[in-house]
Amino acid sequence: MVHFTAEEKAIITSLWAKVNVEETGGEALGRLLVVYPWTQRFFDNFGNLSSASAIMGNPKVKAHGKKVLSSLGEAVTHMDDLKDAFAHLSELHCDRLHVDPENFRLLGNVLVIVLAHHFGREFTPQVQAAWKKLMSAVAIALGHKYH
């Protein structure tokens, strides 16, 4: 289990309060699909994913990105018990969707980049470290059912 300090929790929740879930989620998922094109196979019902511009403008990508990032809100509010908070999603992605758990880590890395882009100077190395720690812990929690 990952332990978050009071300072890390404050950093994460403070930034999360400013995140535009719809915009950031769509951008993060879109970037994942562009940068790691093999992840597109999990979204074959999303229509046109033939180019970066098609992916970034795809309404289904944006909608699912919002859904993914909304789920991340659970991580922010349940940092002390991520395994239980993500048990259902871990089971879904393992048993039904058969998503490679490495993709959770990749999405976390992409999200950190998107947050850095959106928040600029406010996204200090300390903020980056806290968010990287959270995203790593979320990836572990989502991959729990696989082990």
UniProtKB/Swiss-Prot annotation:
GO molecular function, one term: metal ion binding
Gene3D superfamilies, alphabetized: Globins (1.10.490.10)
The organism's place on the tree of life at top rank: Eukaryota
Globin domain: residues covered: 3-147
Protein name: Hemoglobin subunit gamma
Binding site for heme b: H64, H93
Membership in a protein family: Belongs to the globin family.
Keywords: Heme, Iron, Metal-binding, Oxygen transport, Transport
Tissue: Red blood cells.
Listed SUPFAM superfamilies: Globin-like
Role according to the record: Gamma chains make up the fetal hemoglobin F, in combination with alpha chains.
Record's keyword annotation contains Iron: yes
One GO biological process term: hydrogen peroxide catabolic process
Subunit structure comment from the entry: Heterotetramer of two alpha chains and two gamma chains in fetal hemoglobin (Hb F).
A single GO cellular-component term on record: hemoglobin complex
